Structure formats: C-alpha cells, structure tokens
A protein has these predicted regions:
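Acidic, glycine-enriched catalytic cores built around paired aspartates
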Residues: 1-190
Length: 190
C-alpha cells in the first residue's frame, strides 16, 4: 500500500512530480532521481506508523483484494479464502520486480505479510500494531506480522513487560498473529 500512498500523495494530492517522472525514476532504479527517491522514502505517509492517510489506503486495498478473491471457485470445487501469510514469496516477488513508487529499489524483497516495508515503520512498534489492527483480521485465513528487536530493546523485566503489553494491545485491537526476531546486527554478520 505504500506504493499507492506514494502515488496518491506525491503525484495527485501534492503534485511533487508527474507520474511519468516517477515511472522514469523507477525504471532507472532511482539513479539520477535522488530528489524523487528522497521524497518517496522520507516525506511520504507510510503504513506502519499509525498514519490514517497511509493506513486507509492499506484497508481499502485489503478490502478490494479480499472481496475479489474470497468465494471465487477453485478448479476442484472449493472456494478461495484470502490469507496474508506469504511465507517467503515476498523475497521472490521483490527479486523479479523493478523499483516501486515508495522507493523500494529493484530486486529488494517486498514487505512480509502485513508487516510494514523494511525501514518504513519509524514511529515504533506500538504504531505498527495500531496500523495493522485497522484491517479486519477475521476476514482472512490468517495474517503475518513480523517484528524485529535488538536484544537490548527487550532486556530485563521492563523489556519483557513492554513486549507483553505490546502483544496484549495488538490482540485487544483484534490483531491475529505476531512473531518476533530478536537478534543484534553483529550476530547477523557472523
């Protein structure tokens, strides 16, 4: 939904650049178009920040997708039901795509499930769960929200209490599924 948010915000609502200029920038992987890249990455509403501008677009896209897929017949006599559990297909799809209107460069993975685009969630984990809870999780076969923390972020009793409060809040807002990766940069490098 960040790609659509970028188009709506920058091309239509604020006329920061034209659609042709955006497409040219995407085709060039934003090389030579750093001004556009800066606008779409840093000055555009993004999903995962509890920003209704971006979150309303996510809800609208989800509802259109759900309404189109759910109930359609399968080739074996069943019906389709939408889910938001991509496992690893976000990596493949990102790898075969050009750059996106939100500043994701070519060949970079897409977001995971209902997780915000990597680096887009700048207002913290509470804002992420508030954004995610705006969709109706009960209308899916499942959703996937990945949250990443450094070990220091959840260290000690206070850290564990904060994590527990985040989980409780998400489920109180009718969130469905959340999983965590707790690892530091050095461990990933090793």
């Amino acid at each position: 939904s960040d790609a659509l948010s970028s188009i709506k915000f920058n091309v239509f609502d604020n006329q920061k650049f034209t659609m042709k200029e955006l497409i040219d920038a995407m085709n060039d992987d934003f090389k030579g178009h750093e001004d556009i890249l800066n606008l779409v990455k840093n000055k555009t509403p993004k999903y995962g920040n509890d920003d209704d501008y971006a979150d309303d677009i996510m809800v609208s896209v989800f509802n259109e997708y759900k309404d189109y897929i759910t109930g359609r017949p399968t080739t074996r006599g069943g019906v389709y039901h939408v889910d938001m559990l991509p496992t690893t297909c976000h990596v493949y799809f990102g790898d075969v795509m050009i750059a996106s209107p939100n500043g994701r460069l070519a060949h970079i993975p897409l977001s995971e499930g209902i997780s915000p685009e990597k680096g887009a969630d700048i207002n913290g984990p509470t804002a992420v769960v508030k954004s995610c809870s705006k969709m109706n999780h009960c209308e899916t076969g499942g959703t996937l929200l990945n949250q990443k923390f450094t070990p220091a972020a959840i260290a000690g009793e206070k850290g564990i209490d904060n994590l527990a409060a985040l989980i409780r809040s998400y489920f109180a807002m009718n969130g469905h599924h959340m999983q965590f990766n707790v690892i530091d940069r050095q461990t990933l490098i090793e």
